[in-house]
């Protein structure tokens, strides 16, 4: 029996008896979208003819339109652009960048190198912005229920770490005592708040988290790029999963640049370290093999038919 076909070819008979107009309607609804209207000679994004957008809107404005359905205000577009610019690259020590470069030396073209690099931007490397937005939302929910900011922050941190572990995303940095990107991004948020473009609620939450973490640790735990972009994306009303998507979109620029640079530099099969620097071997020392030596006997494989 073929897929989607009932006994005695019922699926085929039902399809043959269906109203052709209804079948066409089903086909056109198969991939329904409110994003683009594309027909011969016509391309409209969210209702706007593409020829009116070309040369009139910036790429960040276009990103906003595609994701949110409307064009942003000038302040909203400027904040989005600032966050995207800030996160484009962090050097070849970032695994995603290194993977993109290594992929080129293994013979992959740019699309393959970029795909290889983007695929590692997951929860541990690439997900901190989304996770930080979740933390901010946890605290914001407590504010909505009437808790003061310091209490909401402390309780929100406790709830988040109880669920996700002790690492708090968006704060502290293994390279930078103070991430140089964060103060500038927060200053832009403050300026936008002064103009009434954003509420400043999540900037206050982010700063409260920074203060509470520093109090608990007894030393400064400054906000990093993920915490700062999480402030911006939350202030702009993006859902947390889009925080990760926007980070990946931004970091893709750096991945492309490094992959292209490596293409020009050449090199074949470059690994994580130069050939002259050995890795650490932790296995047994050299030992001789005796022909009479027997290894451990293998037991029966679970589920194997005798």
Q: Predicted segments — roles?
A:
Residues 2, 10-306:
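Non-transmembrane, aqueous-exposed alpha-helical and coiled segments at domain scale
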């Amino acid at each position: 029996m073929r897929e989607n076909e009932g006994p005695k070819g019922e699926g085929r008979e039902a399809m043959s008896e269906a109203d052709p107009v209804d079948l066409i309607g089903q086909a056109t609804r198969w991939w329904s979208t409110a994003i683009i209207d594309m027909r011969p000679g016509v391309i409209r994004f969210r209702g706007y003819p593409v020829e009116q957008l070309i040369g009139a809107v910036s790429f960040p404005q276009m990103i906003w339109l595609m994701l949110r359905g409307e064009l942003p205000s000038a302040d909203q577009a400027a904040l989005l652009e600032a966050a995207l610019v800030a996160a484009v690259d962090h050097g070849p020590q970032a695994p995603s960048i290194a993977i993109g470069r290594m992929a080129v030396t293994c013979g992959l073209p740019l699309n393959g190198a970029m795909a290889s690099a983007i695929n590692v931007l997951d929860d541990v490397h690439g997900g901190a912005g989304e996770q930080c937005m979740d933390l901010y939302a946890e605290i914001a929910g407590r504010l909505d229920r009437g808790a003061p900011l310091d209490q909401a922050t402390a309780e929100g941190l406790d709830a988040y770490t109880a669920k996700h572990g002790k690492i708090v995303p968006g704060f502290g940095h293994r390279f930078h005592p103070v991430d140089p990107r964060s103060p500038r991004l927060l200053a832009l948020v403050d300026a936008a708040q002064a103009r009434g473009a954003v509420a400043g609620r999540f900037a206050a939450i982010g700063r409260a988290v920074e203060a509470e973490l520093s109090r608990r640790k007894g030393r400064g735990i400054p906000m990093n790029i993920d915490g700062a972009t999480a402030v911006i994306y939350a202030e702009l009303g993006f859902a947390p999963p889009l925080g990760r998507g926007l980070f990946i979109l931004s970091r893709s620029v750096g991945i492309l640049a490094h992959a292209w640079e490596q293409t020009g530099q050449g090199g074949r099969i470059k690994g994580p370290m130069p050939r002259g620097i050995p890795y650490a071997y932790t296995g047994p020392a050299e030992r001789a093999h005796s022909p009479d030596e027997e290894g451990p006997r293998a037991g029966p494989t679970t589920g194997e038919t005798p």
